Structures are given as C-alpha cells and as structure tokens.
Amino acid sequence: VSFYAENVHDFAWVTTPDFVYESGQWNGIAVHALFNQKNGQKWTKKAVVRTERAIEWLSTKFGMYPYPQVTNTDRLAGGGMEYPMLVMNGSESEGLILHEGGHIWFYGILANNEVREAWMDEGFTSFQTRWYMMDRYGDQGFDLSTSRYKDWQKKYWRFNNSLGSSQWGMIAF
C-alpha cells in the first residue's frame, strides 16, 4: 500500500495487525476505515458511512474535499487526532468523526497554526460540529453535540458557573 499527497504540511502513518479494513466512496473520493478487531461491532459499517457523510457535508459547506482519499482509523483512547487525509478517532461517534474530519479543512487545507490560531482550529471545528449535528438532527442535535462536554464540565468545573452550553464551548477552545 502506498499513498502520495501534494499540498500537505503534516502527515501520520498507523499500522497494526489487529486492524479490520472497510471501504466506501463519496463523489469519487475513496473512504477507508481501519478499526481494531475488538471494536468491530461498534465500528463496522458505521465508520465508513459516517466518514462519507462528513466529507459530503463539509464539502458542501466549506469547499470540495481536495484529496483523492480519506482514512478514518480507530485509536487506543477517546478523542481524536487529525492530519490531511487521515483522522484517528477514539470512538465511532458521528460527532467525533465529523469534528476530526472538519480539521482537514481548518488546520489541514488552510495550514493554520494550531497553537497560535486555536480559535480557527478547535474553535471553528467545534462550531461546525454543532452546525452539522443540528442540520442532521434539528434542535436536539445541539444537545447531542455537547453531551460529552457537559459530562466533562460536571467532572472538572467544580465552581458554580452560569455559562450555558453554547458559551462553554466557545470559551473552552
């Protein structure tokens, strides 16, 4: 297997003999999903479909996906990490797949500095994740996209705060 990429500023490579491979495509773009065998019941079919759906939605909102393929891989722990053409997700969550895929635009394509311009990287990608979830699921999509932040907030935000979910997301990133 080999990949060639033009106009990328970062890359990653993953491998394990425990990966299961599935594939699909959207608009001529190859979609690959690699997931650990033990996560097969959760990931199978969902990861490819959700990645296809994410690339389609992001392409209609922010410009056509510029690469010939995208790979969505399972990773050891929760959360995710992104590179041009590759996202690593700690779950098969639709919101997480969209979020990490969104980084391909806001960080990947724009080549912005993730530290100096965090508002454009995490801030804008968090915004687009909520926008997608609301497009797909209506008003309840907002709650679906913020549920993990509410759990985190309860665990780590000990003092009494009066911030709403929408304010918390913008301040957190």
Model-flagged regions — what are they?
Residues 1-28:
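Structured beta-strand-rich cores of soluble
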